A protein has these predicted regions:
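A cross-kingdom feature that marks ATP-driven nucleic-acid transaction machinery
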Residues: 1-137
Length: 137
């Protein structure tokens, strides 16, 4: 059954908060427990003149091995489906991060979701998927 928008919004925010409290478990699932990291969220305003779309990134894991996991946190009542719109949003976030920060690090799109992801052409672009169960393993 579909939940009211306000409830779904609350669940999404609560899920993001749980994820932020379980960074060590996320790093373990990604196989980077032993890598020195800095974890933050990130935001930039739109600036069309400079090719910046405007982005809010739920979690960035900047790794000492010159990789950034760009983590999208998505609450869903079932497997999450990456649509063309979501794929474009992730690509825009990667572009914004590169342009604004000037990073030369590799950027790995990473999905953190409740029940995994529906396999499709867009999900193939993800480097990693972390599920709710992984946070409590």
């Amino acid at each position: 059954c579909a939940l009211p928008i306000s409830v779904n919004t609350w669940l999404g925010l609560a899920f993001e908060r749980v994820c932020m409290e379980h960074v060590d478990q996320i790093k373990f699932k990604l196989g980077i427990s032993g890598v020195l990291t800095e974890v933050n969220s990130w935001y930039c305003k739109s600036d069309p003149d400079n090719g910046i779309f405007g982005s809010q990134i739920d979690m960035l894991i900047a790794r000492k091995d010159q990789v950034i996991n760009l983590c999208e946190m998505k609450y869903s009542q079932s497997e999450y489906t990456i649509t063309e719109k979501v794929d474009r949003s992730i690509r825009n976030k990667i572009s914004d991060l590169r342009v604004v920060s000037g990073t030369k690090y590799a950027i790995y799109p990473t999905l953190i979701t409740t029940y995994g992801v529906v396999e499709n052409s867009y999900s193939q672009e993800l480097q990693s998927v972390v599920m709710l169960d992984d946070l409590f393993a």
